[in-house]
Amino acid sequence: MDPNCSCATGGSCTCAGSCKCKECKCTSCKKSCCSCCPVGCAKCAQGCVCKGASEKCSCCA
């Protein structure tokens, strides 16, 4: 369970715009939980690694 997210990892949940998930793996999470991922990136909620603040993450390149 992500301490910043009210849902179980990989569980079904909805993340609001104020979601502070750092490692959000919720299948229904619609926002980008990764600062370098665009909102709507389908793979972002499955776990991604940011290469840098201004770079795209490994799963959204």
UniProtKB/Swiss-Prot annotation:
InterPro entries in the cross-refs: Metalthion_dom_sf, Metalthion_dom_sf_vert, Metalthion_vert, Metalthion_vert_metal_BS
Residues the entry annotates as binding a divalent metal cation 4: 33-34, 44, 48
Modified residues annotated as N-acetylmethionine in this record: 1
Source organism superkingdom: Eukaryota
Keywords associated with the record: Acetylation, Cadmium, Copper, Metal-binding, Metal-thiolate cluster, Zinc
One GO MF term: metal ion binding
Residue numbers spanned by region Beta: 1-29
Region Alpha, annotated ranges: 30-61
Residues that, per the record, bind a divalent metal cation 3: 15, 19, 24, 29
Binding-site residues for a divalent metal cation 6, renumbered to this chain: 37, 41, 44, 60
Binding, a divalent metal cation 7: 50, 57, 59-60
Matching Pfam families: Metallothio (PF00131)
GO annotation terms (biological process): cellular response to cadmium ion; cellular response to copper ion; cellular response to zinc ion; detoxification of copper ion; intracellular zinc ion homeostasis; negative regulation of growth
Membrane-crossing segments per the record: none
Residues holding a divalent metal cation 2: 7, 13, 15, 26
Gene Ontology CC annotations of this record: cytoplasm; nucleus
Binding site for a divalent metal cation 5: 34, 36-37, 50
Subunit and partners: Monomer.
Domain comment in the entry: Class I metallothioneins contain 2 metal-binding domains: four divalent ions are chelated within cluster A of the alpha domain and are coordinated via cysteinyl thiolate bridges to 11 cysteine ligands. Cluster B, the corresponding region within the beta domain, can ligate three divalent ions to 9 cysteines.
Protein name: Metallothionein-1E
The organism of origin for this protein: Homo sapiens
Organism lineage string: Eukaryota, Metazoa, Chordata, Craniata, Vertebrata
